[in-house]
Amino acid sequence: MAKPKSIHYIDNEKFLKEMVIYKRGLDEAKSKDELPPMISEYLGECFMKIAQRLSFRPNFINYAFKDDMISDGIENCIQYIKNFNPEKSSNPFAYFTQIIYYAFIRRIQKEKKQLYIKYKTMQSAPSLLENVEVSANDGDKGYNQETMNTDQKANMYNFIKNFEDAKAAKSVAKKPTK
């Protein structure tokens, strides 16, 4: 009878062994004042698998910038690989999953900030259009037509309000009380 296939997509024991080997090479390179060793193919594959699988969680699945989130997660894993301590933790899967999770959160926050800037610019655009004169040569070519319907405008204004409210609440929380 065939051995049942493992449901885990990463072998944590092998991942830990590879991390110990990498950490040993990193310590040797540091003592010899050399460049750090290259990350093994297996470690890179693990980072990629963790990031891809985490991107399928319900709280991350529907973002248009999912590839950017995955790239940020892998980049952060490579950046912080030297901080993993096998003497403290024997679970590199959890360590790197957490790094990728917070990279995803940071990317979402960056994208929301960019969307906020875009919406604020669009919100101020009507006031800019009021100061523009349409010449008689333009005729009825539709230059001043609305490009957003009322639902889209409502969503934009709600997003702006929620973003500004969250920002205000965050700044109030940071202020020390007397």
PLM features: residue spans?
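Single-stranded nucleic-acid nicking/binding segments centered on His-rich, glycine/basic loops
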Residues: 118-130
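Extreme N-terminal regulatory/targeting segments of RNA polymerase sigma factors
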Residues: 1-68, 127-178
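Short alpha-helix-to-loop micro-motif enriched in aromatics/charged/Gly
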Residues: 57-65, 77-99, 110-115
